[in-house]
Amino acid sequence: MSQQERLLKVLKAPHISEKATNNAEKSNTIVFKVALDANKVEIANAVAQLFEVKVDSVRTVVVKGKTKRHGAKTGRRSDWKKAYVTLAEGQELDFVEGAAE
């Protein structure tokens, strides 16, 4: 797998929540769902190349999957990784700008 293909597989989706929106407004931090095996360097490179912004820092957390029941059977949702990407001063990335129009 080439490096370009790997960068495309690192970022899965932006994570939109109330906390993520507040972080974006206050501290210029964007939250992404990322591949479970991705590291901070890969995440920073992927964001910088795909969105053409300068990344200041990356923090990651593995979110544990919830246990769910369906009748008498129990199952478990998959674990997933969340990355908080802080952009450099003056950089901006807005996912919901076009949705308001």
Curated annotation (Swiss-Prot):
Key words of the record: Ribonucleoprotein, Ribosomal protein, RNA-binding, rRNA-binding
Entries under PROSITE patterns matching the protein: RIBOSOMAL_L23
GO molecular function: rRNA binding; structural constituent of ribosome
GO BP term, pick one: translation
Any single GO CC term annotated in Swiss-Prot or TrEMBL for this entry: ribonucleoprotein complex
InterPro entries from the UniProt entry: Nucleotide-bd_a/b_plait_sf (IPR012677), Ribosomal_uL23-like (IPR013025), Ribosomal_uL23/eL15/eS24_sf (IPR012678), Ribosomal_uL23_CS (IPR001014)
Any one Pfam family match given in the protein's UniProt record, by short name: Ribosomal_L23
Gene3D superfamilies: 3.30.70.330
Assembly behavior: Part of the 50S ribosomal subunit. Contacts protein L29, and trigger factor when it is bound to the ribosome.
Family stated for the protein in its record: Belongs to the universal ribosomal protein uL23 family.
Record's function text: One of the early assembly proteins it binds 23S rRNA. One of the proteins that surrounds the polypeptide exit tunnel on the outside of the ribosome. Forms the main docking site for trigger factor binding to the ribosome.
Matches recorded under NCBIfam families: PRK05738.1-1, PRK05738.1-3, PRK05738.2-4
Protein name (Swiss-Prot/TrEMBL): Large ribosomal subunit protein uL23
Gene coding for it: rplW
